[in-house]
Design a protein with these regions (language model features):
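Short, strongly hydrophobic alpha-helical membrane anchors
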Residues: 1-22
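Structural signature of hydrophobic alpha-helical transmembrane segments
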Residues: 19-31, 76-90, 134-146
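C-terminal ends of transmembrane helices
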Residues: 35-45, 68, 93-106, 151-161, ...
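Cytoplasmic-side transmembrane-helix entry/capping segments in multi-pass membrane proteins
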Residues: 50-58, 81-85, 106-117, 141, ...
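Short, structured motif recognition centered on aromatic/hydrophobic residues
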Residues: 54-58, 65-71, 140, 144, ...
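A cytosolic-side transmembrane-helix exit/cap motif
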Residues: 71-79, 103-109, 128-138, 155-166, ...
Length: 222
């Protein structure tokens, strides 16, 4: 019996390690996607190289840093793991020196942004679940991870955050994170559930862009 218990324990540890690495990969891919958006914003505002790199890093990591601080994952992964900083800097340099090529790819950039949104939403919700947060808090952490960096980026360049004006931005992140959290109740630590959550978020965001779906805005008197 002890032998069988040991095997079960090892299997559980291996599964947790796989899930942890899966979430880290999602976080890193999302980091690069959002770093590109931050760098593009910097170049558009004619900011120097240092500023572009700062915006690249902020857009890619601010949401994750806020999430980690709130759930007690200290120090935050973005400053503890060299890969986050490296990916952010690479994305910033690529955008700064080859912006003319990236500027021609409006649709691909929107796709990368939507992909980053979905990856961060499910990675944020998944990490919150791993830290034993409740369902509501886990959904909020997924949304914060997905939209936090973009909000800080826009504030730094004196713009209204795109999350308040774009086509179903936060709503898409909310939907993806909710799928992960609800799915985890029935299928704990399930990679397919995370994949479905990502597809829901990315799909909803791209459909909103295509069809110009937006939340209603209050009407002001003339």
């Amino acid at each position: 019996m002890q032998y069988l218990a040991g095997i079960v324990t090892l299997m559980a540890i291996d599964e947790l390690a796989i899930i942890s690495e899966f979430l880290k990969v999602l976080d890193l891919v999302g980091t690069f996607a959002f770093a590109l958006s931050g760098a593009v914003s910097g170049v558009k505002h004619r900011i120097d190289l240092f500023g572009v790199l700062v915006l690249s890093f902020v857009a890619a990591t601010a949401g994750g840093i806020m999430r980690d601080v709130l759930i007690g994952a200290i120090p935050p992964a973005a400053v503890q793991d060299w890969r986050y900083i490296t990916l952010s800097l690479v994305a910033g340099l690529v955008t700064f020196f080859w912006y003319s090529l990236i500027a021609k790819m409006k649709s691909p950039v929107q796709i990368f942004d939507a992909l980053g949104l979905g990856l961060f939403a499910i990675a944020g919700a998944g990490k919150a679940i791993a830290f034993h947060l409740g369902p509501g808090a886990a959904v909020l952490m997924g949304v914060l991870t997905a939209i936090g960096g973009g909000m800080v980026r826009d504030v730094l360049v004196s713009e209204v955050p795109v999350v308040f004006t774009a086509e179903l931005y936060a709503v898409a992140a909310l939907a993806g994170a909710a799928v992960v959290v609800v799915g985890n109740i029935f299928f704990p630590s399930s990679v397919p559930v995370a994949a479905i959550g990502g597809i829901v978020c990315v799909g909803l965001r791209l459909m909103a862009i295509r069809n110009r779906w937006k939340l209603p805005v209050a009407q002001q008197p003339d």
